[in-house]
Amino acid sequence: VTFDDPNEEGRRWQIDVTFLTSHWQCIFGHGCQGVLTERAPEMVQGCCSYGAHFSNRKDRDRVVRAAKELTDDEWQYAKAGRAKGVYAKCGKDEEGRIEWRTRLVDDACIFLNRPGFPAGPGCALHQKAMRTGRHHSDLKPEVCWQLPLRRTDEDQEDGTVVSTFSEFGRDGWGDGGQEFAWWCTEAPEAFTAAEPVYRSMGEEMRKMLGDDLYKQVVAYLDERTQSKPPPAPHPSEVPVQFTRRRPAARGSNGSRRRR
């Protein structure tokens, strides 16, 4: 569905109704197989194996400040982070500008606490947010809290911009995404949330779309989900079907026998 941006003239949004009305949820530590070339749930790395690419300097600086809040008890690689910094160069973009990502330690993001660490496996920044009553988007790199939502902008010949808001599929990772042994938006086991994505990831969507547009999207999707026919289901969302068990027939002696 398409919306005109309520606060920016010349920007039109294309919204992915199918994914936003699905019941996807992050299953980190509860069935997530990771993003390596082989399934590795025992490593509990989620999508943290390659570090997080920063969107811009503002994103990077915010994470640097957040890292300063972490204690040694909260962050397994605190000493490495303080000694070498939490980010490193990772190449250049198409315009020749240096790109940065979170530093890697032992083949995964420096903020990823591993199995066996007393605070438990998972992102130290995410865990910090949960302990302090903040939303994880306040502390984590943008790409981390946005997943699996994705925004792309495309300039038009008439000077306008079309922004597409959709699912972050394998293609979002570049060529390497096709080598993943597993990806969560293709896994039926991840489509088990009680609420649709546009509700469960409301805070993330507000930050990506803006409050005014988010409210318009919610109003539209609320109406669409109640309409007949409902939106097309996501290809990975398998509807749960309940079947009634047939009662066993009784034999001539009163005992039950199965059909």
Predicted regions located by residue number:
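Short loop/turn segments that flank or connect secondary-structure elements
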Residues: 1-259
